[in-house]
């Protein structure tokens, strides 16, 4: 009886061990993909090659590290494209006006292009405009510095001390340039009073009120038939053209601004 009980217990033990046991093949040719079905992941990595483990770790690190910066770069590129599109649309709105300005006045067009890059223009528009107006008088001041350095230095000193220069620099510079004509007009008054009076005609109120009468008066003064001697008429016209030669040597810009005298010769 005892032997039967022991035999039953042995059979039960074998049955229980057979249901809970699993086989690990020592020399199996099965691929590594089948192993995780029977073993946990940590145990399955122990049976892989070291090169395979390093490759999997590298792929995992690359996926975790590079995924977030790629998304950020894509977002930055989209934002940059959006800003570039808005800037292009704004620039296209001003292209017709800038094209017309380029045709009419190329210098003003270039200044308009440099307006955004000038810190003075962004900080103080009034000071920038005053600076642009002062640059219009720089050629005349440069010529004055070459012809007469003492007068140029004196003018620079007066520019810093005069209240008119501080309040309205272009008007002050224009006034100073007009004062340069006074010595030539004085010499003309001594040499030829008639030509001197004719030189003052552009400042006459008759030119402002009635241009036709002013032109008729100029033609009467310049008509050589009214002078009895043609040589005297030619001499007077030559005397009238003399101040313009002096103006062209001293200041070419002012010589272009002066009225043309001696139209009968030309």
UniProtKB/Swiss-Prot annotation:
Alphabetically sorted, this entry's keywords are: Seed storage protein, Signal, Storage protein
Q: Does the keyword Signal apply?
A: yes
InterPro entries for the chain: Seed_Storage_Prolamin, Zein
Residues in the signal sequence: 1-21
Question: Which top-level group of life is the source organism from?
Answer: Eukaryota
Q: Name one GO molecular function term.
A: nutrient reservoir activity
Job of this protein:
Zeins are major seed storage proteins.
Query: Remarks, anything else?
Result: The alpha zeins of 19 kDa and 22 kDa account for 70% of the total zein fraction. They are encoded by a large multigene family. Structurally, 22K and 19K zeins are composed of nine adjacent, topologically antiparallel helices clustered within a distorted cylinder.
Query: What family does the database annotate?
Result: Belongs to the zein family.
PANTHER family documented for this protein: ALPHA KAFIRIN
Which protein are we looking at? 22 kDa alpha-zein 8
Q: Which organism is it from?
A: Zea mays
